């Protein structure tokens, strides 16, 4: 599922994509997929990209700072930036992009020749991801937070669990 979140400076319990018209919105610049899926969501909602003042060249950290400074109205952002903005009162969750449903975020590309030459390697890769996902769906957010906590030394387990839970 899409891990990006749209946060705004004001509470917006009845968010609709059309409400972004006329707003200055910072989008994720570090990787292309969140911007592509947001464009698709907007198109499906009948919203023209030209009606929104986009900030496309800043990092998520820079967009978080810009939201805090009142320089932009909304951000498309990942954790832990989203949680930090919500916890300090600057950001309000407008939309969790995960509601769009399953999407292909972990993808592996190879040639037909490699697949034919190394079928067991390909199968092992897919089976490994399947096993990892099964564990993630079985464990509680706190268990998952504890398992991956060493990768996020600046976050305590409770905060990380809150982010994992969404």
Please place each PLM-identified region on the residue numbering.
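Solvent-exposed, polar/charged alpha-helical surfaces in well-ordered, non-transmembrane soluble domains
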Residues: 18, 36-40, 65, 69, ...
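A bilobed periplasmic-binding-protein/Venus flytrap-type ligand-binding module shared by bacterial periplasmic
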Residues: 3-14, 105-121
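Active-site-proximal catalytic alpha-helix in oxidoreductases
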Residues: 103-110, 126-130
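Secondary-structure end/capping motifs
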Residues: 116-166
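Short polybasic/polar patches that bind polyanions
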Residues: 43, 86, 150
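Short, glycine-/small- and polar/acidic-enriched structural segments
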Residues: 1-66, 73-79, 92-96, 102
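N-terminal secretory/targeting leader peptides
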Residues: 89-92, 153
């Amino acid at each position: 599922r899409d891990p990006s979140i749209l946060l705004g400076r004001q509470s917006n319990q009845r968010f609709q994509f059309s409400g972004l018209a006329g707003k200055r919105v910072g989008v994720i610049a570090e990787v292309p997929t969140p911007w592509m899926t947001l464009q698709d969501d907007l198109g499906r909602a009948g919203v023209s990209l030209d009606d929104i003042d986009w900030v496309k060249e800043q990092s998520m950290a820079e967009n978080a700072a810009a939201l805090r400074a009142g320089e932009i109205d909304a951000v498309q952002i990942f954790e832990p930036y989203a949680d930090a903005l919500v916890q300090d009162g600057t950001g309000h969750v407008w939309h969790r992009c995960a509601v769009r449903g399953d999407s292909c975020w972990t993808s592996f590309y190879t040639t037909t020749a490699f697949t034919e030459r190394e079928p067991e390697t390909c199968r092992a890769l897919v089976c490994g991801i399947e096993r990892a996902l099964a564990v993630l769906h079985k464990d509680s957010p706190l268990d998952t937070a504890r398992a991956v906590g060493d990768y996020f030394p600046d976050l305590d387990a409770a905060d990380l669990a809150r982010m994992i839970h969404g």
